[in-house]
Amino acid sequence: MDPTQLRSAAAEHRYLRGLIQVPVGLLFIVAALGNEHWGPLDNDWVFVAVLVLLAGVAWAVNRFYDEHYGRVTPAADREAKAIGMGLLGAALLFGLALLLRSRADWSLDLPVNPIPGVFGLTMLAYSAAVVTLRPHHIVIWGSLAVAGLLPVWSGDDPSNIGLVMCGVAVMANGVFDHLTIVRTLGPATLPTDG
């Protein structure tokens, strides 16, 4: 790998630790099931226990990446951009979800599913601004945005379906991000003794 390509791979390394996105995606799904009072997730403490379990899985996955691919500290400006995009995305998701469809008096009450629609657009913007926009980002996040913003979501509140859609998209994106890091840096290496 030439030095320019290595610098680029190192800069994106932190943002391509895709398998961490699998427990995050599962959290979206568990939240939707909890909102629906499904089975054991009807109990709030079960949700908390699952949250702790998923945090443990994410920690283990992060440790896997540290041990097999090393650790890279992103440049301060790139990290600031990532944090800024994350905060802006959260504000947009909250605000636009209320504006597009909610019980608020000022809601437009459109027949859309704003959670996946806005989340897909936000993640597409995040991928373009912080990581390098790749074809799988366009397909996954673009499809999620289109599916959420199609005016076919009349009837009951589709928020929990939207959370499940987001969870599946996050996990799929994570798998493709992981494959990108494997293609770029090679398969996971075993630590050597000595």
Regions found by a protein language model. Name each.
Residues M1-I20:
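N-terminal juxtamembrane cytosolic/stromal segments of multi-pass membrane proteins
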Residues R17-L27, F47-L51, F119, G162, ...:
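Hydrophobic alpha-helical transmembrane segments of polytopic
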Residues G25-A31, L54-A55, A91-F94, M123-Y126, ...:
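Helical transmembrane-bundle signal
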Residues L87-A147:
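Membrane-proximal helix-loop-helix units in multi-pass membrane proteins
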